[in-house]
Swiss-Prot record:
SMART domains with a match to the protein in the record: PHD
Residue spans of biased composition, Basic and acidic residues class: 383-399
C2HC pre-PHD-type Zn finger ranges: 6-44
GO cellular component: nucleus
One BP term from GO: somatic stem cell population maintenance
Name recorded for this polypeptide: Pineapple eye protein
Domain of life: Eukaryota
Keywords linked to the UniProt accession: Metal-binding, Zinc, Zinc-finger
InterPro entries assigned to the protein according to its UniProt record, in alphabetical order: EPHD, PHD-type_Zinc_Finger, Znf_FYVE_PHD, Znf_PHD, Znf_RING/FYVE/PHD
GO molecular function terms noted in the UniProt entry: zinc ion binding
Function according to Swiss-Prot or TrEMBL: Required for survival of imaginal disk cells possibly by regulation of cell apoptosis. Required for germline stem cell self-renewal through mediation of BMP signaling.
Annotated region described as Extended PHD domain (ePHD), given as residue ranges: 6-119
Region span, Disordered: 292-311, 323-422
Amino acid sequence: MEDNKELQCLICKYSDTDDLVFGEWMIVRNLQVHYFCLLLSTHLPQRGGDSSGILGFLLRDIREEAAAAEKRKCWYCNKIGASLQCDRCRSLFHLKCGLENRAVFEFCGQYKSYCYKCRPMDDYKRQLQSNPPRNATCPICFSSIYKVELHCVVYGDCCRLGFAHKKCMRQYALTSGYYLRCIWCRSERFRDSIRLQSVFVPDRDATWEKQRNAYRELHERNLKCDQPNCLCPSGRTYNRLSWVILCCSSCAATSAHLKCLVGALRLPKKRERTDFKCSMCLDVERRIAEGPARTTEETNADGDNQVDGSFYVQKLGPDAATRSLTQTPVFSEEDESERSSNITVIFSQPKSNATSERLSLSPPQEEMIVEIPDSPEASPKTSIDENHSPQPIARRDTSDSPQPIAASEIPDSPQPTAASEIPDLPQTTAINVNPELTQQTALNTIPHSPQPEASFSTQLVSQTFDCPQPQEQAVAKAPNSPSLPKEDPNTLLVLKSGFQCPGEPFFYLVIYEFEHGTCMGECIGTCVLRFKEDDPRIQDTSQAALERVNITPDDVWCRSEDRGIFEHIEKFHEWYRSEGFS
């Protein structure tokens, strides 16, 4: 009991221990939850098999639901950790608060919950509520039921012949398992109807079938002929001379005279039979051979785990694909699941800004015209048209001046910092590039050092100027930038944000993830890393230091499909291609 007092459910935050109303404690990898909190949590899907996570509930999903429950307040106690939601009024509450306030739980299908006001009612229930019967007796504990109320008693919907305490019925159902029958009419439909009355029925053998020496009588030799028609004149127990009694070679619980077997099976007298199998064992062997293959592996091999696999039941819904993503930090490890994946070290782009993009420039043509048309209103989209045919532009006489230099060297050219910051132009602007300078001119060169400005830049010019410099020096120069780092820039992390939760001794770092583990691939989402406050790797929380943090698989807390700014960049590229630009 002292160990149970130290336990706290990760979902509901309560430490109550009652197997009948909260279910057994499920403990895996220091994760402790009530089993009924797993089943009845409205937004927690069961995406694994009986050997995955905790009876089909993946550890990642459990921690994700626990983190989401910390944002929900209970309708009754006004505390966080509410994971159950009324299927009709959508009010949230704890499992414990629901039990105390007469909520109804369905332990089948989608495992729905209902508050007291929204509980399902039919004509029979309304009749019991308006005119409750008197002098009822519980057939399990043989105690009187002082008042028949639906939240404290159950009844057999198959026959409606009596009532029983809900607590007694929970113990009876937990003990009986497959063998649960209606205690009034012995109907098998009772198992399905009782699950709608807040009673959990496990799909397993009865507990008395698993007790020590439960089948002791099967190991005792029963030297008595069990054939329907015993032919021995001295009786069924006679075991001498030619009337030898043989035991079943499988169970040893059934025996028969050899002569009785020969007569019953119509075997030839010359054939001497030394063993036989009773009809019950033959039927069991036949069903095992025809049934599906079963595995004898344990659910959890770790000795520290505490999970009873016999409690496994299947839960339908909610659909995991439609669940809302959350940025709340949760564990991401997944236990023996088809959906689990290896943790990959994330590499980053060389840009410190997450919005940076590389532009691949096509080989220069003889004449390249870049036109940016008028835009009536500010827009983050940019139209660029490449025309390979020369077009005349207005210019003054430049017979005595050298050829025009590269656009990036013109001192008065505006240089916006982002695609969304391109100002409205009063007229169409064209850049005429001299083919003699194509081998020496670099347009829109993006340095390979971190830039705090934009994803890309465009140099604009409306006319040419006299340039006294020699033509050999007309080479585009990159803007001033810090010296290149010595390490490979692809090893840097692409940061999104960093934060701390009040009351938690942890620091959370959100980074972007890319396909194939490199920033050259497509962004696939974000990853939340969790570090302790005293971790020496995050003592320096500057951007440059966080980009160079060496992460391990244990640092991964959760993942999300939110791609942030990369989602907008991809939409811009799709629009750009849809307009016919290349």
